């Protein structure tokens, strides 16, 4: 490739070339050691960006130039953290706004980008200092561990099964709680909340089982009979529940690998998870499938407001609230 460039007459910046087990590349430090490739962004950059987000949230407006600079820094991080990308959309939209919103000339209301900035701040304060992601080299020599998560939800409960290398390793079944109903504003037994519960069971499963693949190459198949939940897993964006989408992105942002495969499974084929989600159906007729042994059942934390990092008051993170016009 280099010879081709030379033949074409392109000049090369040899002084920028690097070789070895540790190199710096467009703002990242990349090292190879002990069978791992580690990519990191220096703590000085991350600390400065954290303070920039804090100070921006204390203001009412931001200039276009300042917002463009902030978005550029956030985009630099999003290159390493895939789950940041959905939140970048809000910044790009503010920069490209075409309709008047009564903001002062050359400025943008902070309230129009506040939800993205607040999410960034939660992530940054949960993972302070140098941002690091690691990948094991030997995981690139084979397709990786194959894992599947079967999910289902009903207006009465939630169920999921984790399968690794074709072996069931964990499962859970839980009724919808008072906290679930209060936070997501649906009634128990009301089918109007079905898509919300499908998204919630995805979040719970990913939070529980993310450590299984956090730093490993894993072919993860998320199987559900609900297309909206699958779309959420694929894009980390949802019109159903912005809260669940933000929480899911926060979990995914802390993993080196994302689920690679999303699969729709007809309800009749999603038998185990379907049965688990309907254990509390007042019409009855559902039992725990025989293949799901009791010792593999895992406890699910209580899902009150403390379960959701993005529901914590911004005062807890040391950021002031912005106000609009």
Model-derived regions: residue spans:
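Two-metal-ion RNase H-like nuclease active-site motif
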Residues: 142-156
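Short secondary-structure boundary/capping segments
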Residues: 1-2, 30, 84-85, 94, ...
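C-terminal reverse transcriptase regions that engage the nucleic-acid substrate
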Residues: 19-138
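A short, polar/acidic, helix/strand-boundary loop motif
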Residues: 55, 165-200, 228, 235-237
């Amino acid at each position: 490739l280099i010879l081709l460039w030379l033949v074409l007459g392109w000049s090369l910046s040899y002084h920028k070339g690097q070789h070895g087990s540790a190199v710096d590349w467009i703002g990242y430090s990349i090292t190879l050691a002990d069978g791992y490739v580690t990519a990191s962004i220096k703590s000085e950059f991350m600390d400065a960006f954290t303070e920039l987000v804090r100070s921006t949230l204390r203001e009412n407006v931001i200039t276009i130039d300042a917002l463009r600079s902030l978005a550029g820094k956030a985009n630099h991080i999003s290159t390493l953290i895939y789950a940041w990308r959905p939140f970048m959309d809000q910044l790009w939209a503010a920069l490209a706004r075409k309709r008047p919103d009564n903001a002062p000339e050359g400025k943008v209301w902070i309230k129009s980008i506040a939800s993205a900035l607040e999410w960034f701040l939660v992530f940054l304060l949960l993972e302070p200092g140098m941002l690091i992601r690691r990948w094991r080299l030997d995981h690139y020599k084979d397709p990786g561990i194959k894992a599947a998560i079967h999910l289902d939800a009903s207006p009465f409960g939630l169920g999921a099964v984790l399968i690794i290398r074709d072996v069931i390793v964990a499962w859970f079944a839980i009724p919808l709680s008072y906290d679930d109903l209060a936070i997501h504003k649906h009634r128990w037994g009301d089918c109007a909340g079905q898509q919300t519960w499908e998204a919630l069971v995805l979040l719970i499963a990913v939070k529980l089982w993310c450590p299984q693949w956090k730093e490993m190459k894993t072919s993860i198949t998320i199987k559900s009979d609900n297309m909206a939940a699958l779309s959420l897993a694929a894009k980390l964006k949802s019109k159903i529940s912005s809260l669940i989408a933000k929480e899911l992105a926060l979990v995914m942002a802390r993993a080196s690998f994302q689920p690679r495969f999303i699969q729709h499974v007809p309800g009749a084929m999603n038998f185990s998870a379907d049965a688990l989600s309907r254990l509390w159906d007042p019409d009855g007729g559902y039992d725990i499938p025989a293949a799901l042994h009791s010792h593999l059942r895992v406890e699910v934390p209580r899902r009150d407001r403390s379960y959701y990092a993005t529901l914590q008051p911004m005062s807890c993170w040391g950021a002031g609230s912005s106000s609009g016009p």
